[in-house]
Amino acid sequence: MRTYPALASLQAAMLMIISTGVLAAEHESIGTFDFPTSGSPQAQVHFELGVGYLHSFGFIQAQREFKLAQEIEPDFAMAYWGETFTYNHPFIGEWDAQSPMDTLNRLGATSEERLSKAPTEREKGFLRAAEAYAFTPGTVGKRRTAWMNAMQEVYADFGDDDE
């Protein structure tokens, strides 16, 4: 069997171009927002898609995008933050208590280790809020209250941030 390396390279380039166009169209269809992070531009694209889907209650799609951002940048704390919130579906009554903990533990075994991967105070605040949600024992109501209290601290520090 004959192989054509140039053809394979051309096919790979075309796939990349098409994928980029699909991502741009997909991003456009879920709205626009500004959620800057310390992630690489490649990971940021998937992170923003994840946030868009999360805001649109597309939990499965959001989870996929956050995991893609993690594949691109394994220590991208905000991608784990986002995934943490894809396991709670408030409108259909689904609640998975274990997966948010598992998600954050993939980023780091301890809070200190996880926070060391969040390079800005803003990202540390978001990550602390996700930890409050994931690791507070008890009902989903208790977890949401812990998350709300932690987010009030983020708001106090970054009140001009729309997120």
Functional labels for PLM-detected ranges:
Residues S9-G21:
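Bacterial N-terminal signal peptides
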Residues S40-L54, W81, G125-L127:
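Alpha-helical tetratricopeptide repeat
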